[in-house]
């Protein structure tokens, strides 16, 4: 799952990923703000898809957008306390100036997210 905006790198990545039989998903998020409700709903829906198998989530640095998404997943799926999820994100490199993302993780409530049915995989 690529959290970067679509560009030449993501097109090349998609080709490489699908070329080895895996599924590529792009959910572009800005690096400047926490995810929207629509973005986090789509992301958690994809991460909760039992048929998807292991999922590799990344952004540019793999710390701020990725850290926020994985923290929300930890709270939602693993039933972690928000503080624990934030500590993990910070220990894995979330930038200390990412105050809006930190606030998002501290206040994220899984009950406010209504997951959709997982999308059917497309053929590579």
For the regions a language model picked out, list residue spans one by one:
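Short cysteine clusters
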Residues: 59
């Amino acid at each position: 799952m690529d959290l970067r905006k679509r560009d030449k790198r993501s097109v090349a990545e998609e080709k490489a990923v699908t070329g080895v039989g895996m599924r590529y998903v792009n959910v572009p998020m800005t690096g400047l703000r926490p995810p929207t409700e629509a973005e986090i709903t789509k992301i958690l829906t994809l991460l909760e898809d039992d048929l998807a198998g292991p999922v590799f989530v990344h952004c540019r640095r793999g710390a701020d957008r990725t850290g926020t998404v994985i923290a929300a997943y930890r709270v939602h799926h693993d039933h972690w306390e928000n503080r624990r999820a934030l500590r993990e994100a910070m220990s894995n490199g979330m930038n200390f100036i990412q105050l809006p993302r930190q606030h998002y993780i501290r206040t994220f409530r899984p009950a406010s997210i209504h997951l959709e049915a997982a999308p059917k995989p497309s053929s590579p």
